[in-house]
Regions:
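Pyridoxal 5′-phosphate
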Residues: 1-266
Length: 266
């Protein structure tokens, strides 16, 4: 079988598999424990977050490890509505969004949110005028699927963000960047988004892990309570082996992207 559906998943790099297996064998300690080997693993986690932050163009403290991009989007949208929903109750997305977004919005609608789903143009793009028309002072969040997982349509994120900031300055912007990671050259510090979702298995990384990018100023309610791991944003024993694999995949994918980009230029 010739497998080409890399929008569904990718085969992990051999080096990623080796990294995960080595971490499972040698660094099995709980990073939250107090003894020396566990502290060493916690230090390695900081290094991995720093590497991912460098690749994505943000601060390490702005990244939260999740089990997948679906969880990241749930954390973003449910967390925002839980904190601000009594004052800002409208969330805007499109009919063509990923089920991770649409199902979450369906849940929030049942709990009092006002959901507006824009219909994309025939070319798959969001009409900025359509977006501006539905924005108002009660808009909590606009969720944008930057690269569509089925059609490959790339939204004009810069233009849409400008429309949102001008018409609804209090509104948060969430972006599903799952299909953009490793395929588009970007830096989060240059993008005007407040939250973003990422998945490791779309960049030849391991399944079962992803990231939520959250700007420092953004404070959604916490969904998972417990031991206070990840600065309290996502409690539960941290998954160092998969974080190590994700960081390795990100670094390798960045190098691969640079080579592919140069080859296309030639």
């Amino acid at each position: 079988m010739i497998y080409l559906d890399h929008s569904a998943t990718t085969k992990p790099y051999k080096e990623v598999c080796d990294t995960v297996c080595r971490a499972l064998r040698e660094d099995f300690w709980n990073p939250a424990s107090m003894y020396r080997p566990a502290a060493a693993v916690a230090g390695k986690m900081k290094t991995a977050f720093a590497s991912l932050a460098s690749d994505l163009g943000c601060e390490p403290s702005e990244l939260i490890q999740t089990s997948c991009a679906t969880e990241a989007s749930n954390m973003a949208l449910k967390g925002l509505f839980s904190r601000y929903g009594t004052r800002l109750n409208t969330i805007i997305a499109t009919e063509a969004d990923h089920d991770a977004t649409l199902s979450t919005l369906n849940y929030l609608e049942q709990h009092g949110a006002r959901i507006i789903l824009l219909k994309p143009l025939k070319n798959g793009l969001i009409d900025p005028d359509d977006l501006e028309h539905v924005l108002d002072e009660r808009t909590l969040c606009v969720s944008l699927l930057w690269v569509n997982n089925e059609t490959g349509v790339v939204q004009d994120l810069e233009t849409l963000c400008k429309v949102i900031r001008r018409k609804a300055p209090e509104c948060f912007i969430h972006a599903d960047m799952v299909q953009a990671w490793g395929k588009i050259d970007f830096s989060l510090q240059d993008l005007d988004v407040d939250l973003a979702s990422f998945s490791a298995h779309k960049i030849h990384g391991p399944k079962g892990t992803g990231l939520l990018y959250k700007r420092k100023k953004v404070i959604p309610d916490v969904l998972i309570h417990g031991g206070g791991q990840q600065n309290g944003w996502r409690s539960g024993t941290e998954n160092w082996p998969l974080l190590a694999g994700m960081a390795k995949a990100s670094a390798m994918q960045k190098e691969s992207f640079a080579r592919r980009k140069e080859r296309v230029r030639v």
